[in-house]
């Protein structure tokens, strides 16, 4: 009888040890480009809520648009012993060394919404960013099939900005080649900052004697800066302009008629899925992918979500219906 009791106790102890090994607390370090932007605040809140509901602990830091700060913050998270790094890079070209450091410590790395190039990352989640650019340009050529176009790219160190441009040019090139569209300027907006976009647009208007018919702006923040410059010349609402992110200010401008459209990327879906992927990585599981993208070093397994065009006609059926914005806020 004593032997039987001893065996049962031993089995229970082994089961407890086994269970403890499986149910480890996942620690996630979330390194964000710039929380001064409304867009990333939403991502953070949704991601943290979902990850915590899955039993993970999340440490968040914002680099405020500074690559050296971000590298230092990532190193700090490595030293804190996180299991997974979720990185929204300010500059996806400069993180290969710090990612290598993380990998040496056995830390998994998820690139969130922006690719990290030439680095041994484990997974990438984003939207189809070339498609974003196509949607932007297609919306403008439908409204302004010929005339003077100004191309306003995003941050020159953001890989996504290049992908947006690739998509835009797929649509614009035939119009440019036929002479229907003339590109009268092409500049990139450092840090995606509205104040930089404002200065660029002011200079573009001066250089072209205000003769600009459409502005291919790559997100709502830069569109907002450009529209400030257009407004000062009495051109707001007369010049077609694209956007992206469905920021509250951007949606309000669309309703007012000063911005033509935006691209809504259902952030709830992105952030929730990213949290699930991060926890899977932390548990040494391989998340399901629907694509692979080459980052210069390797083929990175990825999940790419579908972006949605939003203009005055479908605000209610998209961003309001999804709860991304409240109707009362508009």
Task: Map each language-model feature to its residues.
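Bacterial N-terminal signal peptides that target proteins for export
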Residues: 1-8
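Generic N-terminal leader/processing signal
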Residues: 2, 15, 22-25
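Bacterial N-terminal signal peptides
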Residues: 9-18
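A residue-level marker of the well-folded mature domains of exported/periplasmic proteins
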Residues: 23-330
């Amino acid at each position: 009888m004593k032997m039987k009791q001893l065996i049962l106790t031993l089995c229970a102890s082994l089961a407890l040890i086994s269970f403890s090994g499986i149910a480890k607390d996942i620690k996630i370090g979330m390194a964000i480009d710039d929380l001064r932007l409304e867009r990333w605040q939403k991502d953070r809140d949704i991601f943290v809520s979902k990850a915590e509901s899955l039993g993970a602990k999340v440490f968040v830091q914002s680099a405020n648009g500074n690559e050296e700060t971000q590298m230092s913050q990532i190193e700090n998270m490595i030293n804190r012993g996180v299991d997974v790094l979720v990185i929204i890079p300010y500059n996806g070209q400069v993180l290969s060394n710090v990612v290598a450091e993380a990998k040496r410590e056995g830390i998994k790395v998820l690139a969130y919404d922006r690719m990290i190039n030439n680095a041994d990352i484990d997974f990438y989640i984003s939207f189809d960013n070339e498609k974003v650019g196509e949607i932007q340009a297609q919306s403008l050529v439908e409204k302004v099939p010929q005339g003077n176009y100004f191309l306003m790219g995003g941050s020159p160190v953001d890989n996504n900005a290049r992908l947006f441009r690739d998509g835009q040019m797929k649509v614009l090139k035939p119009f440019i080649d036929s002479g229907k569209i003339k590109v009268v300027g092409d500049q990139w907006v450092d840090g995606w900052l509205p104040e930089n976009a404002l200065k660029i647009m002011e200079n573009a208007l001066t250089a072209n004697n205000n003769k600009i018919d459409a502005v291919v702006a790559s997100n709502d923040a830069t569109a907002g800066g450009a529209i400030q410059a257009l407004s000062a010349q009495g051109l707001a609402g007369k010049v077609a302009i694209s956007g992206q992110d469905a920021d509250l200010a951007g949606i309000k401008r669309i309703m007012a008629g000063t911005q033509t459209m935006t691209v809504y990327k259902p952030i709830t879906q992105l952030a929730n899925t990213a949290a699930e992927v991060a926890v899977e990585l932390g548990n040494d599981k391989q998340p399901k992918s629907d694509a692979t993208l080459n980052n210069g070093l390797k083929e990175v397994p990825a999940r790419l979500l579908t972006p949605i065009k939003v203009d005055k006609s479908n605000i209610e059926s998209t961003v309001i219906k999804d709860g991304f914005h409240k109707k009362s806020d508009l």
